[in-house]
Amino acid sequence: LLSRGLGDVYKRQMWNLWHGCHKWSEGCRHCYVYRTDGKYGKDSSVVTKTEKFGLPLQKKKNGEYKIPSGNLVYTCFTSDFLIEDADRWRAEAWEMMRIRQDLHFMFITKRIERLQQCLPPDWGDGYDNVTICCTMENQDRVDYRLPIYRESPIKHKIIICEPCLLYTSPSPR
């Protein structure tokens, strides 16, 4: 999607439906969420549903959606969409994405091995309006995550090498 130059076509909107995370791998060592929350004395390891949870379906007084049609929605950038703590909210999040086919949702995960158990029943080979990005910060994580990611039923995929801790090859060893 973005790698094909389509990212410039979209207006962008942030949707942090839950906040907080648990450091999962070496790439989490200097997490910006932990760093930012630390400035305000907030515990980033506590995952909470945010007041913005229902944003994609919220409407203005005139009846128009608050997020206009055609936006690229950066989803869950202060957590991991597949984090276990959000299992109880995820079905509702998928439903909002299903309803808002006029938006394109994009999230990044380090927990790609949880995808199959977190997908909605009507997912099939993926929603047309969802891009799932997978972080692979070093060769160890490429070797582990890439085979899972390749086999996952996702229509739009982006590999994220951030933070890029060591040289990585796109081929598992």
Question: Model-flagged regions — what are they?
Answer:
Residues 6, 25, 69-70:
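A structure-centric signal for secondary-structure junctions around beta-strands
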